[in-house]
């Protein structure tokens, strides 16, 4: 259900939204960035609710909010309210929906945490593979606002299914006393202690950057297809391949981290992004774009498991909700920065291809920082 608040879904409507509200690339990017930034701030507080509320109670509230947000997008006639619409979608969809799933699985599964996170993220991957093609096809038949009404209906239908599936859910309180997993130095770290540790800050550029520029790429998918001279449908037709690679990478990374831990994997998981964005920058054929999607999928799949397991493995599970809420807020902030930055740079005349060269350089630097941070903390990490 988080798909309705994800960039890959919202950005499909970018052309229609810009036309309806008479927005430039920079205007739309700024509005999207502002709404996403506000949701990042809200996540710092709301994310901690997973430490005190059961998913069975919190989940339906979030899904109801997501359904209302979809209706808000469908019926909002004023550009002044568009940042509020984006905030609601991003907070309830990208923010809380994914956060609840990741924290629940990270807390409930210790020995098989990687596999559990892989399974939890299959829903996201399925949505990423199917919704873009479906929505582009539906937009040929219906007005775009009607598709958002359909999204709201789907979100409402998912509420009773969630309640039924979690009818015997374990509570955060029971997990705090029975199945704790400690972090570095054999202890449970609080949010403030985590923020004071250098490892957190060595990892942040990579986590924020991946969110920022992956979001920016899908946010500008319509513009990207235009400058390459491709039909938009040709581009979204590659999404299932991207998603298939991401699913394979997600499962493989989940299995590997259960066997060897995150420390040996996480410094290298963004290396494919370097070459993906170089292909997007310089490639002019659909084949080059397809190879770029394959490389992008390798990192996106690993992102579904490695960062979530990283927080639990290094800082323990007792305060995982609040710790991951902070990290999630930072990543949501990144997803606000990416579209806003690329949109403004486009308005100032910097071509998207040139921006993607800079993005590839960024991922090289962030991978180096991760390697340094993990190497410094290795002796403190539980085995």
Question: For each predicted feature, which ranges?
Answer:
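Extracytoplasmic
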Residues: 1-25, 46, 217-222, 338
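Helix-to-loop junctions at the C-terminal end of transmembrane segments
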Residues: 42-54, 249-261, 346-347
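Structural signature of the two symmetry-related core transmembrane helices
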Residues: 57-71, 264-278
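Hydrophobic core of transmembrane alpha-helices in multi-pass small-molecule transporters
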Residues: 80-96, 208, 288-302
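Cytoplasmic helix-loop-helix junction between adjacent transmembrane helices
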Residues: 87-122, 316
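Helix-loop-helix hairpin linking two adjacent transmembrane segments in secondary transporters
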Residues: 124-170
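A late C-terminal transmembrane helix in Major Facilitator Superfamily
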Residues: 128, 317-349
């Amino acid at each position: 259900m988080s798909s309705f608040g994800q960039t890959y879904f919202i950005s499909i409507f970018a052309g229609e939204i810009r036309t309806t509200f008479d927005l430039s690339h920079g205007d739309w990017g700024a509005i999207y960035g502002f709404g996403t930034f506000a949701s990042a701030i809200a996540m710092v507080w709301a994310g901690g609710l997973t430490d005190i509320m059961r998913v069975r109670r919190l989940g339906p509230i979030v899904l109801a909010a997501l359904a209302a947000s979809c209706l808000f997008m469908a019926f909002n006639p004023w550009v002044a309210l568009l940042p509020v619409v984006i905030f609601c979608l991003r907070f309830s969809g990208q923010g809380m929906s994914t956060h609840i799933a990741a924290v629940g699985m990270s807390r409930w599964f210790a020995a098989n945490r990687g596999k559990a996170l892989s399974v939890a993220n299959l829903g996201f991957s399925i949505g990423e593979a199917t919704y873009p093609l479906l929505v582009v096809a539906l937009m040929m038949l219906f007005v775009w606002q009607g598709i958002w009404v359909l999204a709201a209906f789907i979100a409402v239908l998912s509420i009773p299914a969630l309640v039924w599936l979690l009818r015997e859910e374990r509570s955060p309180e029971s997990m705090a006393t029975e199945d704790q997993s400690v972090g570095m130095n054999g202890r449970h770290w609080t949010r403030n202690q985590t923020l004071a540790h250098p490892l957190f800050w060595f990892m942040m550029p990579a986590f924020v950057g991946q969110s920022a520029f992956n979001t920016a790429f899908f946010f500008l998918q319509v513009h990207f297809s235009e400058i390459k001279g491709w039909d938009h449908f040709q581009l979204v037709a590659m999404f299932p391949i991207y998603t298939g690679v991401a699913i394979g990478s997600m499962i493989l990374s989940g299995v590997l981290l259960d066997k060897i831990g995150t420390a040996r994997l996480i410094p290298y998981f963004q290396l494919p992004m370097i070459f993906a964005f170089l292909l997007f920058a310089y490639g002019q054929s659909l084949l080059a774009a397809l190879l770029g999607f394959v490389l992008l999928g390798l990192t996106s799949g690993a992102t579904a498991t490695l960062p979530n397991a990283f927080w639990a493995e290094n800082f323990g599970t007792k305060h995982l909700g609040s710790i991951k809420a902070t990290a999630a807020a930072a990543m949501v902030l990144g997803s606000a920065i990416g579209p806003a930055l690329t949109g403004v740079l486009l308005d100032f005349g910097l071509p998207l291809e040139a921006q993607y060269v800079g993005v590839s350089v960024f991922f090289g630097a962030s991978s180096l920082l991760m390697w340094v941070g993990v190497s410094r903390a290795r002796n403190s990490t539980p085995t």
